[in-house]
Amino acid sequence: MLSLQTIAKMAVATNTYSKYHYPILKVFGLWWKNSTLNGPIKICNHCNNIMVGEYPMCYNHGMSLDIALIRAVKERNISLVQLFTEWGGNIDYGALCANTPSMQRLCKSLGAKPPKGRMYMDALIHLSDTLNDNDLIRGYEIFDDNSVLDCVNLIRLKIMLTLKARIPLMEQLDQIALKQLLQRYWYAMAVQHNLTTAIHYFDNHIPNIKPFSLRCALYFNDPFKIHDACRTVNMDPNEMMNIACQQDLNFQSIYYSYILGADINQAMLMSLKYGNLSNMWFCIDLGADAFKEAGALAGKKKKSVTAHIRS
């Protein structure tokens, strides 16, 4: 049951107020100040998202109650952790990113089940397997800059994430930090399953994600996202074509790269190299004629493919 004080704070947070009320709000505990935020805490009347500052609506500015709680735990803001938990935030999510003994004790006192061992990995996998916008965003917020993953087998974790994302997240396993790997993982899962709310959130919160967003759009054959990413990302058309050819039936990605000037003969050979014969025939329809090179390449792979090419 909510306390009278909790209900009163919720009532105040859902109403409009002027700057003259700011001193009262600070005393009342409805103020959030950190390196990026400094303003009154509000609850959106339309979606119940948490807003900080002067915004008439929460679009682009709000965060769910769970996300607000996770961020408060990471900042070790005891009063806000208590406030958001009282308002209905899931303190179990907070416990997953409580990196100090004092915050772990606080989360436990508020009802969280202390996570141990594989619970961290199980939570990461669960939040991505639900294929839900909110769970992907929660997963990103919980495990971004979370030192609890320092104790896991990083090579094994990187391989697992790459297999689940279905798109190469890095060139080599030792050439990317875990933080960046996880950011790419959450983004790739959102693009792969067309979770538009999560994509929009990551576009606004993950720094320098645009080059990888173009790679995802090419790999998952999304011409609209390719066009959007190409406005801000300058990638060589042949590199774009190489990405497009890695997944079979990527006709729109191949055609987009071809229109930008990619070598269609090289695309034909790359498609054959990756074993994507539908892509190869599409390249031939676009004018590719590297049959001699393709025959030699196919001969190294399978004799049956060689015969098929030469027939």
Swiss-Prot record:
Keywords: Early protein
InterPro entries xref list: ASFV_MGF360
Disulfide cysteine pairs (residue numbers): none
Reported induction: Expressed in the early phase of the viral replicative cycle.
Pfam families for this protein: ASFV_360
Coiled coil region boundaries: none
A GO BP annotation: taxis
Superkingdom, natural source: Viruses
Sequence similarity: Belongs to the asfivirus MGF 360 family.
Record function comment: Plays a role in virus cell tropism, and may be required for efficient virus replication in macrophages.
Protein name: Protein MGF 360-16R
Organism expressing this protein natively: African swine fever virus (strain Badajoz 1971 Vero-adapted)
